[in-house]
């Protein structure tokens, strides 16, 4: 019995010694207090529905992120190079990361998705154990054509990767979209319908997903993980207007989007 009490005493004493060290281990979010540039369209633009109560404001409130917002209502992927130039003009390299939330307007405008690469047959020097010599092989290079979504993304990412090679760049897929009517000349059907060039909205989402692999950047799939599905009446609580605008989010929708990003960003470094 005495031996047992002695062991318990020793273990208790050891626990007390280790407790201060354990208590000092505090998790710090990798994006805490960082400076982030936001590129995109109306879902990010403070001049659009929900104003400053956007997802990036949730990140500011919860993580202390300083937002540099360059998104403009109605813009498509071909505007990203301009937004990048504006960032460089105003902040140079004095920021930590870039977040791009774009693609829904490319779908609405009927911009074809296109392909990532053009292929050609060329001569290239190679050797695999034998004397080096010229070989005939197929080569592919990124499409740099602003008339397709893939081409636009290639142009934008090539520019950003060239301008800011040491910065973290995170792509956000578009979220689901439903009916929106902004006047007789601007009526946007839901994602249940193909666009004017005969492509589904999900094809544009998939292109942003693939862009992560093409350009070696992380992608947060908000289409899948945001939990917001505007085609259902039950999700009207997250939308700007249940009758006329099921495209844009209200502050509650952005709060949910921002909360999702807080946790998704835990898995990514902001700086290197």
Tell what function each PLM region has:
Residues 62, 84-272:
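Alpha-helical cap/lid subdomain in secreted, periplasmic
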Residues 22-73, 78-93, 98, 233-234:
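Serine-esterase "nucleophile elbow" of acetyl-processing enzymes
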Residues 1-10:
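Bacterial N-terminal signal peptides that target proteins for export
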Residues 7, 22-34, 139-152:
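Solvent-exposed, charged interface segments at domain starts and junctions
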